[in-house]
Amino acid sequence: MEYFDILTVDGLTLKGKKVAPASEPKAILCIVHGFGEHQERYTHVIDAMIAEGIAVFTFDLRGHGKSEGKRGHAKKYSYLIEDVEEFLMHARREFNDAPIILMGHSFGGHIVANFLLKKTTSEIAAAIISSPWLKLAFEPPAFKVKLAKIMANIYPAYSDKSELDVSRLSRVPEVAEAYSKDPLVLNTITAGLFP
């Protein structure tokens, strides 16, 4: 396992991790995590992929986990797309020939889908979009939606509680419990990232 840094277009340092099998990897899986979580929540996926001879790269999104930036915020949505591009270029430099599979879960799935729509690249052999955040699973109070829209234009870094119902994360109660107790998990979102 190796840790690495990614320098963003606006000067932030994002924290990443590479885990590779002992032999030359069959493929590279690049994981983009969901909103509020971080790369260390994907160790079960990493372990399964390593057992299959697949190298795995992960990173903490800006404002998440151990990466720099205001918690739960991106100054511009386009920065998230640029961050994924830098992340993929890092993985490609590590392994020149292995096919890259780009995976995004939840908000990460949202970012990956937009990356694929906005960027032209021959680097990605396949994509996995797991339970993408296409819209909120609940309807927030109307005043919060109006406030978020106003604040997104005036002060995009304004934050409020995300109101995520952790009991809906998994049918396994221990998953929700671990999420709730994880000090690197966020429970706030900024107006600039509000959908």
Which role does the model predict for each range below?
Residues 1-23:
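N-terminal cap/lid segment of alpha/beta-hydrolase-fold proteins
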Residues 26, 53-54, 97-99:
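Short coil/turn segments at beta-strand junctions that form active-site/ligand-binding loops
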Residues 26-34:
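Short beta-strand element of the alpha/beta-hydrolase
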Residues 36-38, 65-95, 99:
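Catalytic nucleophile-loop/oxyanion-hole region of alpha/beta-hydrolase
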Residues 39, 46-70:
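Conserved alpha/beta-hydrolase
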Residues 107-192:
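Alpha/beta-hydrolase-fold enzymes
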